[in-house]
Swiss-Prot record:
Coiled-coil ranges (or none): none
Residues bound to Ca(2+) 4: D486, D488, D490, K492, E497
KW Transferase (keyword) present: yes
Location of the EF-hand domain: 365-400, 401-436, 437-472, 473-508
Name of protein: Calcium-dependent protein kinase 8
Chain positions recorded as ATP binding sites: L70, G71, R72, G73, E74, F75, G76, I77, T78, K93
EC class of the enzyme, as a word: transferase
Main location: membrane
Length: 538
């Protein structure tokens, strides 16, 4: 239910988890959603509302001093917090009771505190120091984690060796094992919910954010769709699941650690859901041919679509790949992680070719606008843009990318790799950044590829269209494009699939953070109605 990391978060990111909690299915034993708030869940912070059953106290200031803001969300603010007597530093998440508008909001906070108190001390689970409640706020004093997210270390490091991936996976699964032994299902395991205690390489990894966690009894099944889409088990979409979902999510994280992208990826929520239901794991693209067979075997067993035969946390920890992790290869698996987390760089050659086609069909006004921008950036008036020229121009477009991302973007646009952008290279990247491509442009680009007018881009048409883009018509690249874009896996690309590719980016991390729980819940119902997923309970 919150991030106790010392790295500031945006309001959008900080508030996302709480918004999800507001949309949970109503408990039949509590007040229904469509009724006016009762005293148990007073909407506007009504005086007398008590959220916690057993708060540490009422006066936070008597023992702790709040410092600078670490993060802000819809329901509250996380501050640096210092214990007056010892000088020890913590994170304090102050949740405004005025913003707990429904009984479900109140129950979310209450349950998170109870779960964190219930869990025994563990080196890889963030600890709750104290929980105060006054007239206006609930204050959760927690262990301060200043080492950043697991995800960010993946990106910064650029790749993981198998040995490093095994060490991280062992930690994550040990957390799952501890939760399950104490009757807690996390339900939202993902790289963002694991923080490092400090910035040292030897820093312990800590599980955080128990806001979607729930107590469970052996054999109990749940129906509420929660979690983040790329880490969601198929039985969650089928609305019949138990603690096995945490092992699935840990398996998704392992897959990402080894190759840099989620195993079930698409550019639409429906595509993601369908990929999860199909549960076909790709071990063909790089760097998988270089990954050991024991590692791939563990991924397969953790991503078993049948929860009844999926490995338990205990079985995962006994798997040879983890049991003998120090014997695993310590050779880097390449730069796949960085390469695949880069939006424009990860854009496949089909999309780049399509952007060129669109550029040729721009209206005079659109073309003039881009030419004018290029001329303004080209301060030396030599028809070429340096990185500094490009950076200044992108800022003028209103895109505040960090320099590191801009460098990646420019490198991807710089087709001839001479370190500068000419006008044609600039046109393609401008269309991407400014999202100029409209439906008419996309239709023209699709028609360019669909030479036989069948309504599909077929493999032969793809080969012919990209003959100038690919040295020797590399079959691996052709097959990779089909795998990436062909979401219904019929071996060809429909207009809808092509349009989705053109309109969306490939930044799956951002998509994960912008996830709408209600939309995914509605999507589950839609897929059940159209027969994409069955109502079986396995």
């Amino acid at each position: 239910m919150g991030n106790c990391c010392g790295t500031p978060a945006t309001a959008e990111e900080g508030g996302k988890r709480r918004r999800r909690g507001k949309q949970k299915k109503a408990n039949p034993f509590t007040v229904a959603y469509n009724r006016a708030p009762s005293s148990a869940g007073a909407a506007a912070g009504r005086p007398g509302l008590m959220v916690l059953r057993d708060p540490t106290g009422r006066d936070l200031g008597a023992r702790y001093e709040l410092g600078g803001e670490l993060g802000r969300g819809e329901f509250g603010i996380t501050y640096l917090c210092t214990e007056a007597e010892t000088g020890d530093r913590y994170a304090c998440k102050s949740i405004s009771k005025r913003k707990l508008r429904t009984p479900v909001d109140v129950e979310d906070v209450r349950r998170e505190v109870e779960i964190m108190r219930h869990m025994p001390s563990h080196p890889n689970i963030v600890s709750l120091r104290a929980a105060y409640e006054d007239e206006d706020n609930v204050h959760l004093v927690m262990e301060l984690c200043e080492g950043g997210e697991l995800f960010d270390r993946i990106v910064a490091r650029g790749h993981y060796t198998e040995r490093a991936a095994a060490a991280v996976t062992r930690t994550i699964v040990e957390v799952v094992q501890m939760c399950h032994r104490h009757g807690v299902m996390h339900r939202d395991l993902k790289p963002e919910n694991f923080l490092y205690a400090n910035k040292k390489d030897s820093s312990p990894l800590k599980a955080i954010d128990f806001g979607l966690s729930v107590f469970f009894r052996p054999g109990e099944r749940f129906t509420e769709i929660v979690g983040s889409p790329y880490y969601m088990a198929p039985e969650v979409l089928k609305r019949h699941y138990g603690p096995e979902v945490d092992v699935w999510s840990a398996g998704v994280i392992l897959y990402i650690l080894l190759c840099g992208v989620p195993p079930f990826w698409a550019e639409t929520e429906q595509g993601v859901a369908q990929a999860i239901i199909r549960s076909v794991v790709d071990f063909k693209r790089e760097p998988w041919p270089r990954v050991s067979e024991p590692a791939k075997d563990l991924v397969k067993r953790m991503l078993d679509p049948n929860p009844m035969t999926r490995l338990t946390a205990e079985q995962v920890l006994e798997h040879p790949w983890l049991h003998d992790s120090k014997k695993m290869p310590d050779i880097p698996l390449g730069d796949a992680v960085r390469a695949r987390l880069q939006q424009f760089a990860a854009m496949n050659k089909l999309k780049k070719k399509a952007l060129k086609v669109i550029a040729e069909h721009l209206s005079a006004e659109e073309a003039a606008d881009i030419k004018d921008m290029f001329d303004k950036m080209d301060v030396s008036k030599n028809g070429q843009l340096t990185f500094e020229d490009f950076k200044a121009g992108i800022r003028k477009l209103g895109n505040q990318m960090p320099d590191s991302d801009l460098k990646i973007l420019m490198d991807a646009a710089d087709i001839d790799k001479n370190g500068i952008l000419d006008y044609q290279e600039f046109v393609a990247v401008s269309i991407h950044v400014r999202k100029i491509g409209n439906d008419e442009h996309i239709q023209k680009a699709f028609s360019y590829f669909d030479q036989n007018k069948s309504g599909y881009i077929e493999i032969e048409e793809l080969r012919e269209a990209l003959v100038d883009e690919i040295d020797g018509n590399d079959e691996d690249i052709i097959n990779s494009i089909i795998r990436d874009v062909d979401t219904d896996k019929d071996g060809k690309i429909s207009y809808d699939e092509f349009a989705v590719m053109m309109k969306a980016g490939t930044d799956w991390r951002k998509a994960s953070r912008q996830y709408s729980r209600q939309r995914f819940s509605n999507l589950s119902l839609k897929l059940q109605k159209d027969g994409s997923i069955s109502d079986d309970t396995q």
